[in-house]
Swiss-Prot record:
It comes from Oltmannsiellopsis viridis. It comes from the Eukaryota. This is ATP synthase subunit beta, chloroplastic. The gene is atpB. It is an enzyme of class 7 (translocase). GO terms for molecular function: ATP binding; ATP hydrolysis activity; proton-transporting ATP synthase activity, rotational mechanism. One of its GO terms (cellular component) is chloroplast thylakoid membrane.
Length: 481
C-alpha cells in the first residue's frame, strides 16, 4: 500500500505486545478507527522496517491501539508512526487479473508493480437496498449436478463442504473457467488463513489450465489474494475484505458478474477471535469474539446482486470437530443460499465432480423459481437416488436378483443417473485427455427426464459416464455396441 500524505501526522510507538501496538499521537490529530498507520524506522541491525497496522481502538491519553498486518519483528518503542488518514487501500481493475496480492494489495508474485490509480478502501458500506436486484435468478454454471439439483442463486452465497482430495480445487477452477466463457465475468480468489502450499498448488494449476494466462496476463480470468495461516491474525482477518473490494470494482464499475471464492470462511472468524482476545475483549460463546455476527454480517452483506452486476460467492466452510452447532459454522449457515457437499464415496467410484446429490441443498429449488419442469425433474432424480440408497444394504446382503422387478428398474435408472451426473471438465483436460463440456440447463433437464421415463433403459450405464449431454451418451453407447 502506497503512503503519500502531504502533511504527515506522526505518532510514536509506546507499547508492543505481539501483533498489537499502542501508538501516541498529539491530542488534536488522533487517527480514526480503521485508519491505516505505518511504522517506519530502522531496527537494531540497521535494516529499514515498514509495518502497516490498522487502528482498532482509541484508548484515551492520546493513544490508539492498532493491529499489525505483518510481523512486528524488529519494531521498538519510540519509532515513528505515520497516519495515512485513510483505511487500507488496495489496487482494483483489470490490472489485478492474473496476479497474486497480499492483504495490503501488494503483489507477491515477483511480476512487478500494479498501477494503483484510484484504488479503493477495504472498508466500504454494503449496497443500498434501492440498488439491490431483488429478482431471483439462477446462476448457470454449465455443471449438470449443480444446475439441476442444487442451483446457485445469482448474487447468492454458496457453502462448499469437502475433505482433502475430493476435487474442491478442480471444481473451483471449472467454475472460474465457465463464468468467464459463459457470462463474460471474472473471479477473485481470497485465500484466507489456509496453507501456503495449497495457494502455490492452486496458482500452478491455474497457469497449467490457462485460467491464468502467463503470456498475456490481461486475458486471465482471476485475481488472487492470499493471507496464509502463518500471517498475523490482523492480515488473516482483513484479507477477505481485500478480495471482496477487488470483486466489488468489477461488479460496480465494470458492471460484470463476478465469482468470489473464499477459502476458508472459518479462518476469517478464527482470526477475528484472535484479534478480539488480543484487544482484551470479553469472549463470547465457545471463546469466540462477542462481535462474531456483526463481523460476519459486515462481510456477507457486501456480497450481493445490484442493478449493475452481481457477486456470487462460493465459500469453503471448515467445520471444527464436525460440530455443526459450533458458533462459527452456525453463523455462516445463516447467510448461505445453497450448499455443495463433496462426497468421498463418489470420488472413490471415479464420479467427478463428486458432488453429493442428496446432501447438497439450495433455497432456489422451488417450482415458482425454477419452473415446474425443472423442479419436477430434480425431485424425481432425488427420489430415485434416495430409493437406490435405501436398497443398497439389501443388494449388499442378498444381491440384485432378490429385488422386485420394480426395484431392479429403480436401481438400473439410479445407476445411470449417478453416472450421468459426472461430467468432463475443461480444466481437467490436461490430465484426463477428455475435452471439457459445458451443458446447458435445458439439455440437462431433457437428459435426466428421458432416463426417468425409461426411454433409455436399453442403453448400457457405462455410456452415461463422463459425457456432456444426452446425444453424447447415445453416441458413446453406439461405440460400446
Amino acid at each position: 500500500m502506497n503512503v503519500s500524505v502531504e502533511a504527515k501526522n506522526i505518532g510514536k510507538v509506546v507499547q508492543i505486545i505481539g501483533p498489537v501496538l499502542d501508538v501516541e499521537f498529539s491530542a488534536d490529530q488522533m487517527p480514526n478507527i480503521y485508519n491505516a498507520i505505518v511504522v517506519e524506522g530502522e531496527n537494531l541491525a540497521g535494516t529499514k522496517v515498514s509495518v502497516t497496522c490498522e487502528v482498532q481502538q482509541l484508548l484515551g491519553d492520546h493513544c490508539v491501539r492498532a493491529v499489525s498486518m505483518s510481523a512486528t519483528d524488529g519494531l521498538m518503542r519510540g519509532m515513528d508512526v505515520v497516519d495515512t488518514g485513510a483505511p487500507l487501500t488496495v489496487p482494483v481493475g483489470t490490472s489485478t487479473l492474473g496476479r497474486i496480492f497480499n492483504v495490503l494489495g501488494e503483489p507477491v508474485d515477483n511480476l512487478g508493480d500494479v498501477s494503483n490509480e484510484g484504488g479503493l478502501p477495504i472498508h466500504r458500506p454494503a449496497p443500498l437496498f434501492v440498488d439491490l436486484d431483488t429478482q431471483l435468478s439462477i446462476f448457470k454454471t454449465g455443471i449438470k449436478v449443480v444446475d439441476l439439483l442444487a442451483p446457485y442463486r445469482r448474487g447468492g452465497k454458496i457453502g462448499l463442504f469437502g475433505g482433502a482430495g475430493v476435487g474442491k480445487t478442480v471444481l473451483i477452477m471449472e467454475l472460474i473457467n465457465n463464468i468467464a466463457k459463459a457470462h463474460g465475468g471474472v473471479s477473485v480468489f481470497g485465500g484466507v488463513g489456509e496453507r501456503t502450499r495449497e495457494g502455490n498448488d492452486l496458482y500452478a494449476e491455474m497457469k497449467e489450465s490457462k485460467v491464468i494466462n502467463e503470456d498475456n496476463l490481461s486475458e486471465s480470468k482471476v485475481a488472487l489474494v492470499y493471507g496464509q495461516m502463518n500471517e498475523p491474525p490482523g492480515a488473516r482477518m482483513r484479507v477477505g475484505l481485500t478480495a471482496l473490494t477487488m470483486a466489488e470494482y468489477f461488479r460496480d464499475i465494470n458492471k460484470q458478474d463476478v465469482l468470489l471464492f473464499i477459502d476458508n470462511i472459518f479462518r476469517f472468524v478464527q482470526a477475528g477471535s484472535e484479534v478480539s482476545a488480543l484487544l482484551g475483549r470479553m469472549p463470547s460463546a465457545v471463546g469466540y469474539q462477542p462481535t462474531l455476527a456483526t463481523e460476519m454480517g459486515g462481510l456477507q452483506e457486501r456480497i450481493t446482486s445490484t442493478k449493475d452486476g452481481s457477486i456470487t460467492s462460493i465459500q469453503a466452510v471448515y467445520v471444527p470437530a464436525d460440530d455443526l452447532t459450533d458458533p462459527a459454522p452456525a453463523t455462516t449457515f445463516a447467510h448461505l443460499d445453497a450448499t455443495t457437499v463433496l462426497s468421498r464415496n463418489l470420488a472413490a467410484k471415479g464420479i467427478y465432480p463428486a458432488v453429493d446429490p442428496l446432501d447438497s441443498t439450495s433455497t432456489m429449488l422451488q417450482p415458482q423459481t425454477l419452473g415446474e419442469e425443472h423442479y419436477g425433474c430434480a425431485q424425481a432424480v432425488k427420489t430415485t437416488l434416495q430409493r437406490y440408497k435405501e436398497l443398497q444394504d439389501i443388494i449388499a446382503i442378498l444381491g440384485l436378483d432378490e429385488l422386485s422387478d420394480e426395484d431392479r428398474l429403480v436401481v438400473a435408472r439410479a445407476r445411470k443417473i449417478e453416472r450421468f451426473l459426472s461430467q468432463p471438465f475443461f480444466v481437467a483436460e490436461v490430465f484426463t485427455g477428455s475435452p471439457g463440456k459445458y451443458v446447458s440447463l435445458s439439455e440437462t433437464i431433457q437428459g435426466f427426464s428421458q432416463i426417468l421415463t425409461g426411454e433409455l433403459d436399453d442403453l448400457p450405464e457405462q455410456s452415461f459416464y463422463l459425457v456432456g449431454n444426452l446425444d453424447e451418451a447415445i453416441a458413446k453407447a453406439a461405440t460400446l455396441g
